Amino acid sequence: MTGGVGISYEFAKFSVIGFMLIGMFFVGFTRKSWPYILFMVLLTPGILFSAINLDYDTNFLSAISFNLSGPICLAITALYCFKRKITRERFEHILLAILLPIISMAVYLFLYTPNIRDVLSGTHSNFAASGGYGPNQVATVLGLGMIILFGRIITIKSRFINILDLGLLAFVSYRGIITFSRGGIVTAAVCAAAFILVYFLTADRREKSTLLPRIAFIAGVIMVTWLYSSISTLGLIDKRYSNQDAAGRVKEDVSTGRAELMKTELDAFYEAPFTGIGVGKVKEFRLDSTGIESATHNEVSRLFSEHGLFGLIALMVLVTTPLSLIFKKKQSPYLVTFLLFWLLTISHSSMRIAAPAFIYGLALIHIIHAKPRTIIHRK
């Protein structure tokens, strides 16, 4: 986005892997996180079949790195984070550390992208409004910022911080909406609803009494932000979310081609249901069968097609392992929220960026309340 030279877009994923390995070197990881070791083992047969099935002119290492850097990043992060105890205050500091770069990105988009009316060309995703980077990925990250800001407004009991976060929520939401990429924004809305539900079920009576006014303020801010976005885009954003083109005609495919990509990946799974067709092979399979040259947008169907039965078991490991944490009494609402963010994001944007992998790991953290220190007074 900023025109950086020499830094790969995979840098973030490998950085997360590196930091997590350093953390495990110093403090280790719990034995109960063994399912994520199993997850990595289940990915290895796909590498073997990739070496057998990939075309001769395909760069084997690039294909493996592009498709497995995300899952490996997730597994390493989960190994480190699973049931790791952390205080609520420290967890909020981590969320703030995630939020601040997202705000910086939103400010960059505000300063260095053209006026949205100057780059309107229809109801498709807008690269110019996304800083020249993938609108899907930009909207995903901005959606993550919206989720964190939403959680802060609900949980932090400070009027000044709440007002500041409401303003930032409006700003980040606006920048996310005008990318014209729906995935990240819809994901943020679903995750916010899940956060409210879990918070309401686990909060005490005093916390519940403050919930409704806060939700009302947030709803008002979002409505005003959407109205401003609609005016700024001359109503095209309304047509985008109504699945219409600029002329107001309803589009046949609400998934913008993702359903066709998913269909070819499932066809590949039916062709080799036990072994899969090999890591990175689905792109070649799609080109041969449909003439469409496109990477996957759905990590779930990619696991099925490229890893076969091993991919199905691997997905079951990722879904079922956190279930042991969900039903614990007084569980943090961030657990369900972050798991939903991971699942919805990999379903529309695969694992192009490190965010879904890292956020999945954060969902596994065990948040505890810090005990007040006992002060010993000397006579």
Role assignments for model-derived ranges:
Residues 1-29, 44-54, 341-343, 356:
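N-terminal signal-anchor transmembrane segment
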Residues 11-16, 36-48, 57-81, 93-99:
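Aromatic-anchored transmembrane helix interface
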Residues 25-37, 152-166, 203-213, 322-337:
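Membrane-interface helix-loop-helix junctions at transmembrane boundaries of multi-pass membrane enzymes
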Residues 92-119, 133-202, 325, 339:
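Alpha-helical transmembrane segments of multi-pass inner-membrane proteins
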Residues 110-113, 199-248, 266-271:
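A membrane-periplasm/extracellular boundary helix in multi-pass inner-membrane enzymes
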Residues 119, 125, 129-131, 246-307:
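Long extracytoplasmic/lumenal interhelical loops at the membrane interface
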Residues 200, 306-342, 370:
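Hydrophobic transmembrane alpha-helices and their immediate junctions
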Residues 335-344, 350-379:
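Transmembrane alpha-helices of multi-pass inner-membrane enzymes
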